[in-house]
Amino acid sequence: MPQFTKEQQQAIDDRGHDILVSASAGSGKTTVLVERVLKEIISGTQVSELLVVTFTKAAAEEMKTRIKTALTKELAKPGVNRKYLREQLNQVDTANISTIDAFCLEVIRRFYYSVNLNPSFKILTDETQAALIKERALREIEAESLTDENSGIRYFYDNFAGDRDANSPRDLLLDLYNFAMAKPEYRSWLKNLAKIYEVNNNIVKSKLWQNQIKSYLLNTFVSLQKKIEEYLNNPTIETKELAKVKEDFSLFTQNLDKFIDAIKNDEDYDQQRNLLRLCKFEVKYRKSAKWDEDIQEFYAETQKLKSEAKSQIFDIFTAFYATDEKEQTRIMQESQKIVSAISKAELALIDRFNELKRNENFLDYSDMEQLAYQILSADTSNSQMAREFYQNKFKEILIDEYQDINALQERIIQQVKNTDKNTLFMVGDVKQSIYGFRQAEPSLFLKKYHGFASEENKHEKRILLSDNFRSTEPVTKTVNQLFKSILSSDFGGIDYSKEGQLIFGAKYYPDALPKASEIIVHKKQKDIDNDNNGIDFSEVEMVLARIKQLKKEHFQVLDSTTGEVRALKYSDIAILTRSHGDNLEIMQEFAKRDIPLFITDAENYFQTFELTVIMNYLKIIDNPDQDIPLVTVLRSPLFNFSEKDLAKIRINSKNSGFYSAVASYVGIGDELSDRCKNFLNKLDELRKFATTHRISELIWSIYAQTNLLEIMTGLPNGEQRRINLEALYERASSYESAGFKGLYQFINFINRMRRSQKDLAQPLLSKEAGNAVRLMTIHGSKGLEFPVVFYLGMQHQYQLRDLKGNYVINPDSLGITLRQEHYRVDSLVKAIGNVTKKRQLLEEEARVLYVALTRAKQKLILVGDIANLDKKVQDWSIELDQSGQLSLADKLSVTNPLGFMGPALAFDKHIVINMNDISNALDQSQSVLYVEYKDSDNFEFKKDEDKVVGDSKNNNYTMDKLISTTKKLYQFDYPFKDASETTAYQAVSEIKKAFNDPIETELENSRLLSSTNRYLQPIDTKPNFLYQTKFTGAEIGTATHLILQYYDYTGDGSEKQLDYEIEELIKQKKLNPDIVPSLHKDQIQWFVHSSFAKSFWKNPENLQREVDFSSLISAKNLFKDFSDANAKILVHGTIDGYFVSNDGIILFDYKTDHVNKSYLDKSINLIKEKYTGQLRLYEQAINEFGEEKVIGKYLILLDAKQVVEVK
């Protein structure tokens, strides 16, 4: 039985009111949540009466697993109600323990009619495909509106015309869409965006000024006023040497006081503007070298304060007082018109986007939440029924990671909540709210955090879980030391020093373990902070050196599985970075040192070597007149042209494009010209192939023709490379399944993904990466823990691009820049919007830092390559106030993590040691070791065990490996000849006999091979009755399938209807009229009126017919004794039909095979055996790509007029 703290037990046992659990990192929140659910179930609340909401599928699955494990343990106890507990255990998998999206989807499936939705909708799971449809909608809106000079859209587009940055009007509309879709009433939200611009010729009296700008100005200048007063009250300033300094500051504060009073008293705008212009430092004075040292130091501090004050005055004036009131009013009025036009354009985009999705019967993720909210909130009888259904169903609603909820999700939960019938249990940590880019609103958590804290509040309760059971004491001390100075009530919304600190609870760590956190710094020679948005590679050198040391000294860690102390493994180490932009370079550095590295969230998919090769091949298949892609393909191991070869080709044709140069070289007549001819022939074949086949088939054909999969598998990290290539095929197939076509459009789609920095994550290996160091982004590490954590990127510049563009979007406003004839000017909404956005971004960056540092269990190592370190240490020493806090102004001026960390780390108060002395220093008592890495430090790297070498951008290194591997491949006696003697593309019609025929599968594989290099089935003998007509059995079967494909289940079902539908197919030239006399209409009539087809008539919208699919199937599942266990074959086919029932998918296939009536059972069994494999393929394809799963497979035997189930 776990021992819970008093607060944990309270969170488990408390009932009868809403509860917010604020659970700090490592405090066991998931354990508490599971234990609470278990207690609910034991006390009689069925698992089906609980709604448990998480924010990821993985978290939902983990939650289910933990609950099942807990119930299983409970079942083993004596005296329990085993029947009841078994029932609950069996219900866990189908219970409402899911993501918010999955719950919304259930609401829609159950009450789709409330919003007039076709129940056979398909989920558009690929966000990038949704983005393509959205872009299509946007282009249609533009085409319809931009030609009209009087249109509102044209008016607002003109305001952004000529922008050179990314902030175009199209970007604005697409960004605004994401904000709108997270709002419960997005239409009214969009329409109200223009209202904030109303000033009514009195800016100071406007709601914008009174509600937002006034408080910001007062907070800023009162803070500055207090800081100056502290200096004026310091005795040092009374010395005669500083008399002029005192006079200067005194005159400044007198004017500042008048300005502050004017703000407080709401004096008119122009008066405030004039008073602010008087806030200057005008007294002249100079520092003397003769002054005492303490006076010189104080003088330096006053000059820094003076510079800060001047900067604040300038920033405030340019943002809020740049023009007089008359001009400012005009700017606001013009901006209001533009924002009104933007809102109308956005609504038009949303409506068109929805229309295009509905035409294809698609729903995307934003639809799920919006439609679910509409169903639950509308003032209709259907919505009331939906609300009451869920309010009565659930006795408690439990929400995990509540800090990540947005306004729409919160409102959905509130619709299910009923004070008289159920309660809310919310668990989260606002310090870990790091998903602002997904419109998460931590303010929702904070509102409850403060509101639930009151002892007078009897209906709502707050519980704090502060004990950290993950980390050693030095790690918790380091985290607390940092965040006491960063997070406060006015920055982050929580007073960390009083309520947010971690309490060391992991007292199970042996005392003898080395625990101290480390800060390893290198003094960079030149400050290039402004240009450095990534990792400095001396940081990687420091990490490599420290890992080397840790391995060499057999650093001891506590194994969480065995409870025993053991030597450090590579897999115990995680390297955390803010972004993934440097992953490939870091992989290269680790590869050079033979230290295994595994990238767990490598969102650089299209930058990997193998994807670069195949994407360039696709580009030249689409258009060969592209020199860079063409040369890349020629130089690749697919064709192995050397640099010398390419030079000869270019010299022969100096002025043409490279494709023309290759074609021209064919006439030279040497060995290279033969290779050029071979390349051009293959390219021509693929270009022709591309015009008649799907993109996915083209990709697989390239793999088969070039052995690209085998080549890449032979390289280091080859299995990951192979999976990457297979995933491209899957993505192309998904792209086409969504209705998109064309190689050119597919390439553009991929390019757009890369440009928008939405590169795809590499599909991870199903197995873990073994003994390798993990490299991941901080966002990717959330929820994980590691014995040793390296944090890189202390100098990584925060991305504040949103503030520099021509618009800024916040939860309650859209601020724009107004374009004038010769200049641009920010509206007041944009000015205060910049302030709000910057604060939100910096608060989130502080939380990101918190998440990173709390991943460490035993050792936290901060790594930084810092320019001007000694100067920075001096500045940091004076930035904290007496309570150890950074001022709000200092926090809001931070530009990188070091700006938060530097002052709190107090470098000046600690002894700095060298890298070589770390081991000896680990016995010291301090919780943090300050380590300097010098360029003279030299660490030899030797090869170690379990190497995993990553990608490299070193062309020679990569190319040598590739060419070597390619030569081995072609000189090798290939053991899997059966794979090489078949194309990787197979039609179901060709493999269905080989799949399941008990006689044929016993033959040698070569019996099934033909000159076309496919596994071919023997041609079936035609049934005797078919010889009586001039049409073959296949032709009649095809015609029958066609009629059943288009049969209308909303008609009257009569013979006249059937005749009418046949006539329509003939008119549409889909059916040959001569075949009609040969059709067996009685078979068709039998089937459409059979009991099997009854559901088709009731819910025809749930019926899908003639569904094309392509799927990768393991060759060993298709062909017995296939030699390569890992080989896959592309299978393409068409499913006759399936019906989506409430329980799942019912799959069926029509068969017109002749049935011998004299031996009916035997004939049916033979047909069943013949086609079982085919239906299993169909089932596998549907289960692999669809949301619902197949629950039944049936053969429709038209000749026998029977429906036969296939197991």
UniProtKB/Swiss-Prot annotation:
Pfam family, one: UvrD_C
Record's keyword annotation contains Nuclease: yes
Alphabetical list of PROSITE patterns matching this protein: UVRD_HELICASE_ATP_BIND (PS51198), UVRD_HELICASE_CTER (PS51217)
Domain of life: Bacteria
SUPFAM superfamilies: P-loop containing nucleoside triphosphate hydrolases, Restriction endonuclease-like
GO MF terms, alphabetically ordered: 3'-5' DNA helicase activity; 3'-5' exonuclease activity; ATP binding; ATP hydrolysis activity; double-stranded DNA binding
Alphabetically ordered keywords of this record: ATP-binding, DNA damage, DNA repair, DNA-binding, Exonuclease, Helicase, Hydrolase, Isomerase, Nuclease, Nucleotide-binding
Cofactor: Mg(2+)
EC nos: 3.1.-.-, 5.6.2.4
Domain UvrD-like helicase ATP-binding: 2-472
InterPro entries: AddA, DNA_helicase_UvrD-like_C, DNA_helicase_UvrD/REP, P-loop_NTPase, PDDEXK-like_dom_sf, Restrct_endonuc-II-like, UvrD-like_ATP-bd
Gene3D superfamilies: 3.90.320.10, P-loop containing nucleotide triphosphate hydrolases (3.40.50.300), PCRA, domain 4 (1.10.486.10)
Positions of ATP binding: A23, S24, A25, G26, S27, G28, K29, T30
UniProt-listed GO biological process terms: double-strand break repair via homologous recombination
Subunit and partners: Heterodimer of AddA and AddB/RexB.
Similarity field: Belongs to the helicase family. AddA subfamily.
The name this protein goes by in its record: ATP-dependent helicase/nuclease subunit A
Organism: Lactobacillus acidophilus (strain ATCC 700396 / NCK56 / N2 / NCFM)
Taxonomic classification: Bacteria, Bacillati, Bacillota, Bacilli, Lactobacillales
